[in-house]
Structure formats: C-alpha cells, structure tokens
Amino acid sequence: MALGDANVGSAPGVDFSALQRVKQSEELLAQLYVVEETPRRLGRGPVHALMVISVLSVVAFIATLLMRYNTFVTMSEDTQAKRSNYEVMIQRRDNLFGNLVKLTLNHAALEHSIFSHTSDKRTEGVEAGKGGPIGSALEQLMKQGGIGKLLGDIGGGKALLGADGGFGNALGRLMAVVEQYPTIQSVDTYKHMMTSLVEMEDRIATRREDYNAAASTYNIEITKWPWNYLAFITGFKRAEYFQEKPAGDTPIITPQLFQELLPLNHAQDIKK
C-alpha cells in the first residue's frame, strides 16, 4: 500500500502551475480584446443648427401665409370698392335720367308757352293798333330780327311797356322770364340731355371694366395652387363678373316719351 501510494503520488499528473499560467494568459487575452461600448454624444453645434433652421422655416412659412392673407384682403377690398363705384354710377344714371327728361320737358314747354303767348299777343296788338305806336314799334322790331330782337332790345321793350293795354303788361312779364332764363332754346337742351346720357353711359362702362379687371386679378390669386387652400380655409370666395345688362334694364327714350319731349306744336305735327 505504501508503495502504491508512493507510485500514485509520484505518478505523473497535471501541472497545476502551468494550468494557472494558461488561465492567467486567457484572462489577459480576454481583457485585451474586450470592446468597450461607451455611448457617443453628438456635438451641440449640429443640434443647435437644426433647431435654428426649423424655427426659421416655421417663421418664414407663417409670415408667407400672413402676407398672402393680407394680399387677399387688399384685393377683396379693392374689388368691393370698384363694385360700389359701379353701382353708384348706375344709381346716378337712374336719377339723372328722369331729371334730365323732366328738365327738357320743362324747357320745351316754357319756350313753347313763351313764344306762343308772344305770337298771340303780337297778333292781337297788330290788329288792335295798326298805325298806332304799339303796332308800328312792334312791326319795326319784328323786321329787324323777329321775336329775339324784340326781347333783346331794351329800348323797344320799355317803349312798349309805356303804352296802354294788356300787351304791355304781358310783355313785361315775358321780359322778366327771359331775363331769368336768357338762353331758352329747346334744341340746346336736347343736345345737353343726350350728351349727359352718353357721358353717363361711358362712365358706367369704364367703372364696369375697372371692376371686372380687379375681380379677375383677385380670382386668379385665390384660385392658384397652393393658395387656393388658404383662400378656402379663410373664407375668400370668387367675385362675380358684371355682364352687359339686357336692353330692357337700361333706361331708354321710347317713341311716346320722345313725343312728350317735343314742343307741343311739333308733337301735333308728328301726330298728324
């Protein structure tokens, strides 16, 4: 047994020191090849730049929206103002048309009344005072220039006013009317009326063209992409264009009204 134990103890076995050295070598190799995973931190510079760019982009976008919105408001107000100007001209045309017709009627009737009354009184005066001072002065003035010369000659008018009879009083009243209306001529009144009507129609056409041009610019701006979305969200709608009105909606001078505009004697001649 002792010999056996001695053989076992002395038998070749494992070298523990060598094993320890191998183990230490493995540990050293493991430590050498260990990958250290340390978190990387981004630099503050790139992050700050990205934040600045983002903020500036948002500010620029909002500023663009506000500027475009203000442009829509300006164009809308300009369109409404020009529409109002057009409607004002329409109302003015409607008001002045009736006034011009009435004014022409009054002038024509007044002129007709004056010359008709003068003619009647002249005839009565000539028949009643042939050879007298009234008849002689009246005939002389009529030969010099007719009724216009009679009314314009102050000396002859005063001579007639000094005579007896109703003709002198009537002529005095007539001269007072003529002095108040020195240019009572129906032809000129008609010309002025037609000129005024033409001017009003030209102004209305100009106002309509101005409005349609403004409406076209406004409609283009609110319908272009991508601003049509902004216009839809903010409630801007297309402006309607003015079209030419039908003839029935425009004031016209009918044949009946034209006959009323004529002096009475001319109207009677036309009817005949």
From Swiss-Prot:
Main location (coarse class): membrane
Factors inducing expression: Part of the probable 18 gene mamAB operon.
Topological domain spans for side Lumenal: 68-272
Record carries keyword Iron: no
Location of the protein in the cell: Magnetosome membrane
Signal peptide as annotated in the record: none
GO cellular component term, pick one: magnetosome membrane
Transmembrane segment boundaries: 47-67
Membrane topology (Cytoplasmic): 1-46
UniProt membrane topology term: Single-pass membrane protein
Superkingdom field: Bacteria
Record's keyword terms, sorted: Biomineralization, Magnetosome, Membrane, Transmembrane, Transmembrane helix
Consequence of gene disruption: When both copies of this protein (amb0972 and amb1005) are deleted cells have no magnetic response and no magnetosome membranes. Deletion of just amb0972 leads to an intermediate magnetic response and still makes magnetosome membranes. A careful electron cryotomography exam shows that in the double deletion empty vesicles that might be magnetosome precursors are present. Deletion of genes mamH to mamV (amb0961 to amb0978) gives cells with no magnetosomes and no magnetic response.
Described purpose of this protein according to its UniProt entry: Essential for magnetosome formation. Can be used to induce magnetosome formation.
Similarity comment text for this entry: Belongs to the LemA family.
Record's miscellaneous remark: This bacteria makes up to 20 cubo-octahedral magnetosomes of about 45 nm in diameter which contain membrane-bound crystals of magnetite (Fe(3)O(4)). Expression of just the minimal mamAB gene cluster (amb0961 to amb0978), including this gene, is sufficient to form a minimal magnetosome chain with small magnetite particles.
Name of protein: Magnetosome protein MamQ 1
Protein source organism: Paramagnetospirillum magneticum (strain ATCC 700264 / AMB-1) (Magnetospirillum magneticum)
Underlying gene: mamQ1
